Amino acid sequence: MLKFTLHKKDGLARRGTLELNHGKIETPVFMPVGTYGSVKAMNPQNLHDIKAQIILGNTYHLWLRPGLEVVEQFGGLHGFIGWDKPILTDSGGFQVFSLSDMRKLTEEGCTFKSPINGDKLFLSPEISMKIQTVLNSDIAMQLDECTPGETTREQARKSLQMSLRWAERSKKAFEDLKNPNALFGIVQGAMYEDLREESLRGLEEFDFPGLAVGGLSVGEPKPEMYRMLHAVGPMLPERKPHYLMGVGTPEDLVYGVAHGIDMFDCVMPTRNARNGWLFTRFGDLKIKNAKHKPDKRPIDESCTCYACQNFSRAYLHHLHRAGEILGAQLNTIHNLHFYQVIMAEMRDAVEQGKFADWQAQFHENRARGVD
């Protein structure tokens, strides 16, 4: 089940509500990534505390470990991981296609070796839909071929045409399995605007309830990603939610919303947190730097997260230097809280018709830098 209601537009920026089987989501929204069924360094209560509305699980990794037979015993991923809000799962395609020297691609699907034990495995649109049905994610993704940014036009066209055929197979399998959740299609086409439009027009035939923009943030220069988003954003159908996969920095989120994107996911806030890289309203802070050793201030004095309300930069510096697990947890709480705050502020700005003003102030603040 999926119902998307568009409440307000301000330029291309949108404010909406997405109703799914496990709850309602206010958009635009950022989805923390829980690759193996857990958002690294966070438990479900932490996620509730930072007001995360939906998380992402990784089909490929959960298929390999713990395996479908385990998750199925819990009625799906929600019961297995103890999370009662919506979950989106990717198709597994990105991870499989990343195994370039370990996989063989055909029209039927992709054969590859398990990086865990070397077993020969096969992933097709039908198998991906079966896995995601067992996971019982609120939003499943079609299986597609993710092409790198430097793909030639000929390669990109051939790839997107196969992804369209896989979209048709994904939808048929999803419906045959009587999956009660929602399936999104994925717009491909590499860095070619006309191919992106061709992909989008091809997907219209299948009437997916939501569409994702894939194949960005896969190694191309940032200006190229922005150029493509600038071109694709206005093409996306107004009545459906728009999801930008695997992106990105705070600035990327703001650019995406400004170009009509409703949903985002990225490992950046969690991965950077574990490496001591913290995002703040006034730029980024590297907590491992020696200058923070005696600093009594919080990460960001304007932040209301648990880490900023209770701990100093000095303590967080110490935890990071000592390799303490608590350091990774507090850093992650802060970064994900900051991302959720950005999204909430953008929702409010669109509602008030002041998104451009908010955007200008956001960039001014971020350029100022952290004291």
Swiss-Prot record:
Binding site for Zn(2+): C303, C305, C308, H334
GO molecular function per UniProt: metal ion binding; tRNA-guanosine(34) queuine transglycosylase activity
Stretches for region RNA binding: 246-252, 270-274
Record key words, sorted: Glycosyltransferase, Metal-binding, Queuosine biosynthesis, Transferase, tRNA processing, Zinc
SUPFAM superfamilies in alphabetical order: tRNA-guanine transglycosylase (SSF51713)
InterPro entries: ArchSynthase1/Queuine_TRR (IPR050076), TGT (IPR004803), TGT-like_sf (IPR036511), tRNA_ribo_trans-like (IPR002616)
Enzyme class: transferase
Catalytic activity: 7-aminomethyl-7-carbaguanine + guanosine(34) in tRNA = 7-aminomethyl-7-carbaguanosine(34) in tRNA + guanine
Active site positions, chain numbering: D90 (proton acceptor), D265 (nucleophile)
Known cofactor(s): Zn(2+)
Cofactor binding mode and count: Binds 1 zinc ion per subunit.
Residues reported in the UniProt entry to bind substrate: D90, S91, G92, G93, F94, D144, Q188, G215
EC number: 2.4.2.29
Gene Ontology BP term (one): tRNA wobble guanine modification
Cellular-component GO terms for this entry: cytosol
Function: Catalyzes the base-exchange of a guanine (G) residue with the queuine precursor 7-aminomethyl-7-deazaguanine (PreQ1) at position 34 (anticodon wobble position) in tRNAs with GU(N) anticodons (tRNA-Asp, -Asn, -His and -Tyr). Catalysis occurs through a double-displacement mechanism. The nucleophile active site attacks the C1' of nucleotide 34 to detach the guanine base from the RNA, forming a covalent enzyme-RNA intermediate. The proton acceptor active site deprotonates the incoming PreQ1, allowing a nucleophilic attack on the C1' of the ribose to form the product.
Subunit note: Homodimer. Within each dimer, one monomer is responsible for RNA recognition and catalysis, while the other monomer binds to the replacement base PreQ1.
Stated family: Belongs to the queuine tRNA-ribosyltransferase family.
Protein name: Queuine tRNA-ribosyltransferase
The species this protein was found in: Neisseria gonorrhoeae (strain ATCC 700825 / FA 1090)
Source organism phylogeny: Bacteria, Pseudomonadati, Pseudomonadota, Betaproteobacteria, Neisseriales
